[in-house]
Every structure is written in C-alpha cells, then in structure tokens.
C-alpha cells in the first residue's frame, strides 16, 4: 500500500539523520551489491569503498547504534505492534548497485525521507510487477514475503528512505 504525502515534504527533509559525515562512530554501514554486503564503520573507509564501487549504503539497526527521533519512533512502533521493530536507513544515488529482486522476512513500513525511490512490487507470485515511485513524505507498506526490486530514478538522482521492519519476534 502506497500512501502519498503522509508527511509534509519540507518537514520531512528537515529531520536530521545520522548519515554520511554525521554518522555515529559505532554505526556500521553495509555497502550492498547483490548478495554481497561489505560492512564498514569508519567514515573514511565507507567513503573510500563507495568511491571504488558505487553501491547502496545501508545503515543497519539505526535505532540502536545512533541517537535520534527515529529511535523514539521505533520504540513507539514496538509498543503498538508488540513485535520487535528495527529501523534501517538506505541511502543511494542513481546507478548505485543494490540487492536486486528479493523479498524480506518482515513487514516493512517505509518512509521516503529524501529524493525518490522506484519500486517494482510483485503483489502476486506470478504476473507483472506494479511500479511505485515514492517521494519525500510518502509511506509504503510492504508485506512480509512480497517480492520487490528498487532503484533510484535519475531525477532527482538521490534517495534516502527508512525501513521500520516489524519482525515476527514478540516483545
């Protein structure tokens, strides 16, 4: 389910995120290329690895490794859903390598924070995918096990989205 403009775009873009130079020292960043995840925590090492081969940067377990409003949102969602929730940030540019088509083992509540993201979603196991473009302030609910593939459109050429992954683990 794609819900457009849940949050005001200017307000959403104004929210601080600990990415790039602002990332916490303990925050691990995975650079993904297919099923290859190259993890780094040093800012300079992340920048160097990205320059060598442009890949989507994944800030895993952001709610645990960094402080900010997203940690509070994660705790509130955990309390409401009564399931463990994990917040992860995905940062990419047009042309960055990524996971390719895959499915996830959690219910994803995805919030587009910066730029835009193109999603191909296969609601059925057979048939053509549905194309969805999320823009700043949009929310996409992606059920567990639904096959999808993402890319960053040439315009604006940049994307940051948060995934609040609602797991099967009860709390």
Language-model features: locations:
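Active-site region of the double-stranded beta-helix
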Residues: 33-138, 146-171
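Conserved beta-strand-loop-short alpha-helix elements that form
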Residues: 141
């Amino acid at each position: 389910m794609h819900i457009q403009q849940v949050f005001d775009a200017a307000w959403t873009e104004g929210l601080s995120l600990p990415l790039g130079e602002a990332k916490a020292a303990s925050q691990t960043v995975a650079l993904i290329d297919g099923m290859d995840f190259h993890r780094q925590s040093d800012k300079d090492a992340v920048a160097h690895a990205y320059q060598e081969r442009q890949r989507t940067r994944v800030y895993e377990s952001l709610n645990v490794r960094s402080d900010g409003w997203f940690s509070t949102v994660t705790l509130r969602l955990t309390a409401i859903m009564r399931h463990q929730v994990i917040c992860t940030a995905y940062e990419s540019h047009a042309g960055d390598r990524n996971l390719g088509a895959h499915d996830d083992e959690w219910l994803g509540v995805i919030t587009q924070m910066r730029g835009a993201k193109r999603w191909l979603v296969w609601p059925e196991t057979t048939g053509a995918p549905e194309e969805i473009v999320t823009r700043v302030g949009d929310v996409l609910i992606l059920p567990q096990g639904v096959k999808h593939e993402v890319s960053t459109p040439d315009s604006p050429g940049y994307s940051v989205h948060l995934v609040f992954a609602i797991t099967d683990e009860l709390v």
